[in-house]
Amino acid sequence: LTEISVVFILSIKLKQITVSGAIILRKNPETSRPEIFATQRGYGDFKGGWEIPGGKLEPGETPQKCIVREIREELATEVKADKVIGVVDYDYPTFHLTMHCILCTIVSGDLKLLEHEAAKWLNKETLRSVDWLPADLLILPEIEKLLISA
């Protein structure tokens, strides 16, 4: 690459996408072990990849309000946004993702899959058994801490 092309490449600004992701934590009803809810994308470039459920912030929306709305829309479930456990920044090839990862508890509903292909409850042993999307991989150490301390 020439110096000019390097400067040009570095000056290209990636599209910024800001999302909230729900870390829905529960105790397994049979084993009492802590586990989190993971979903498999059912559409788009990342179809088939696993993620914590969530979606894009709307203008003027807080990450907490966003995650409550997104889980209602995607999973027909009401959650309480408890606290942000981390913020992930990741550069995909065509956009920069900022993901607010929010610990959530279920208030009501049965987590119906309205947009996802599949879902699983994962514990500390099975957490890394699915093919996580690259940005979601970055929050796994924090999720592991939650699963150990819960």
Q: For the regions a protein language model found, what residue spans apply to each?
A:
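Hydrophobic packing within well-folded, soluble alpha/beta domains
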Residues: 63-71, 84, 102, 119
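Active-site-adjacent beta-strand/loop module that shapes the phosphate/pyrophosphate-binding cleft
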Residues: 17, 78-80, 87-110, 118-120, ...
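Conserved hydrophobic "DFG−1" position in protein kinase catalytic cores
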Residues: 24-25, 38, 104, 121
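NUDIX/MutT-family hydrolases
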Residues: 103, 112-143
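Generic C-terminal helix-cap and adjacent flexible tail
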Residues: 144-150
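N-terminal amphipathic/basic-hydrophobic helices that include classical n-h-c signal peptides
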Residues: 1-12
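Conserved N-terminal beta-strand and adjoining loop/helix that marks the start
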Residues: 11-36
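Conserved Nudix-box catalytic region and its N-terminal flanking loop in Nudix hydrolases
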Residues: 33-73
